[in-house]
Amino acid sequence: MVIKIPSPEQIAKMRVAGKFASEVLDFITPHVKAGITTEALDSLCHDYMLNTQQTIPAPLNYAPPGYHPFPKSICTSVNNVICHGIPNEKVLKDGDCLNIDVTVIKDGYHGDTSRMFFIGEVSVLAKRLAQVCYEAMWLGIDQIKPGARLGDIGHAIQAHAESFGYSVVREF
């Protein structure tokens, strides 16, 4: 497999796309609270991406071969939903855990990020799981360097999760 090294200009465009994705999460953060629906959060993000950023919400209508198009602009995974939850009219309530996953396209480059939100007070177990996941993410990121293998990243993440009695989702 040949790995093509991007040019400095391409890397700059990647950074811009990533910054825009992060800005969507910063924009939506004050709106994430009990009483709002994930559908409303999606609508706010959609409008912000299109009208303020002039970015394209990558998930909207994305369909890999054999699948139905994704109907929303962001993914909202509530509580036990692992990933790629579809925003809907369910009202968020105190104690919910919500992950918002944002992917934007700007000048042909994708920026993809997510953030975990706690709605009000969540259980100690939910806080512990989120903390272990956060730590595992950084341990994986720390493995990224010239000559590293993808398996090194996965191993660091999996070893940390398993040391706390958790496992890593293999298929979703």
Q: Residues of each region from the PLM?
A:
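Active-site neighborhoods and metal-handling regions in enzymes and metal-associated proteins
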Residues: M1-F172
